[in-house]
C-alpha cells in the first residue's frame, strides 16, 4: 500500500530515498534563489527592487541549502541508506522516530517559505542577528516564522542524531569493534554528536530572540540590560560546529570513493582518519568567536581564537594527505565518482587555504563581511559538500536504484559543474580583496567585471543542474541493470545486490577474520 510504504515508512532505505528526493527538490529551490542573487549582481543597478527583498532571497538561499539540501541528503539520505548496510544492522535503532525526523522537514520548509510571503520577509541573513531581527527592524511575522522553521529542522536533526548514535554504537554485530566500522559510519557518528551538542544552543538563542520579539524580554536589548553580542555567541557556538556537520559526512563519502576507485581494500591511515575527524569535531566547538573578530574582543581573546582556528588545519591536512596517499600506487579508475572526489580534494583544499587566511584576526578585520568570506565558504560548501554529494550520488546510484547512469553524460556533467562553480566563486576572492561588501544588492561600477563573470559562471552551474535531472531521468528510463560490483568484500553495502532487498541483515552477520 502506497501510504503505508511512503507516509508511515519505518524502513531505513525508503526513508533514505524520501530524504534524497526532498533534498533534491529543496536543492532546486536553493539553486533558483542563488540564480536570482547572481542575476541581481550581474550588472550594477537594481533588478528586483530594494535591498530588503534581496536580503530575503539571500537568507532563504542559505537556509534552504544548509537545512533542506545538504543536511537531508548527506545525513538523512546517505546516512539512512548506508549506515545500517555498512555495519550489518537490520535497520536503524528507532525506525518510527526515523520517520518522524523526515516528516518534520516538509512543514519546516513550508514555514520558511511562508516567512518570505508575509510582510516584508526575513531579510536578516542566515545568522538572524538582533537588533536587525528584532521587532522594530523586522516588524511582522516573518522572522517568527523563520524561527519556528529552524526549531522544527533542529528537532528533526536532534532526533536523527540520537538515532544514528544509538544505531552505530549498539547495532553492530558482536564481532566487530568500533575501530572496524567504515569511515563513513564514523563520520556520521561524529556528525551526530556535533548536532546533539550544538543544536540545543541554537534553540536557546532563537527562543530568546522569539521572546525578545513577542514577550518584551530584553535578552539582546541593551535598554533592559541585555546584549546583542550574547546572541552572536549563542548562534556561532552552534554555527561553527554546523559547518563541520555539513562537511564531515562528505569526508566519509570521499574516503570510500577514493579507496574504491583506487582499487585499494582500505583507505591509507584508517586510524589517523578517525582521529582527524574526532579532532575536527572537538576543535569545531572551541573556535566559534572567529566569526566575531569585528565585535571588539580583547587582543588575547583574538589571539586564542586565531591560533585555535589554525590548529584545525592540521587534522584537515592529515585527511587530505591520507586521501592522496590512498590514491598513490593504486589502479585508478577514472569514473565520474572519482572525478568528483578528486575535484573535492583540490577545491576543498583551496577553500581551506582561504580559511587559514581568514583565521588571522587582524586580516579578518579587513576581510570580514566582504566577498572574500563568501568565496571562502562557497569553496568548502559549494565545491566541498556539493561535490561530495554528487560523487556519493553517482557512486551509490546503482545501489539505490539498481540502474546505471550514462558514464559519458556523468563526466560531461562533472566538467560543466567544475567550470561553472570555479567561474562563479574564484572572482569573488578578487572582489573581497578589493573591498566589495556582502549582502548588498548593488555596488560601485569598479566591481562590474568580476561580478559579471561570476554571474555567467552561475548560469553554467545551472546548466549542470538541469543536465543532472536529465541524466537521472535517462538512467531510470533506460533501465540498464547493474552487471556486477567489484570489491564487495571490503564494501559491505553492495553485498545484497543492486538494489538490496527491502529487508537486509535480518540476523547478525558472521565475521570470519578479526579484520573487516
Swiss-Prot record:
Principal subcellular localisation of the protein: mitochondrion
Pathway: Energy metabolism; oxidative phosphorylation
Cross-link 1'-histidyl-3'-tyrosine (His-Tyr), where in sequence: 240-244
Transmembrane intervals: 12-40, 51-86, 95-117, 141-170, 183-212, 228-261, 270-286, 299-327, 336-357, 371-400, 407-433, 447-478
Residues in the Mitochondrial intermembrane compartment per record: 41-50, 118-140, 213-227, 287-298, 358-370, 434-446
GO BP term, pick one: mitochondrial electron transport, cytochrome c to oxygen
Residues involved in Na(+) binding: 40, 45, 441
Binding positions for Mg(2+) per the UniProt entry: 368-369
Subcellular location: Mitochondrion inner membrane
Binding annotation for heme a3: 376
InterPro entries attached to this UniProt entry: Cyt_c_oxase-like_su1_dom (IPR023616), Cyt_c_oxase-like_su1_sf (IPR036927), Cyt_C_Oxase_1 (IPR000883), Cyt_c_Oxase_su1_BS (IPR023615), Cyt_c_oxase_su1_dom (IPR033944)
Cofactor: heme; Cu cation
Leader peptide range in chain numbering: none
Coiled coil: none
Entry GO terms, CC: mitochondrial inner membrane; respiratory chain complex IV
EC number, UniProt record: 7.1.1.9
Subunit structure: Component of the cytochrome c oxidase (complex IV, CIV), a multisubunit enzyme composed of 14 subunits. The complex is composed of a catalytic core of 3 subunits MT-CO1, MT-CO2 and MT-CO3, encoded in the mitochondrial DNA, and 11 supernumerary subunits COX4I, COX5A, COX5B, COX6A, COX6B, COX6C, COX7A, COX7B, COX7C, COX8 and NDUFA4, which are encoded in the nuclear genome.
Protein name according to UniProt: Cytochrome c oxidase subunit 1
Gene giving rise to this polypeptide: MT-CO1
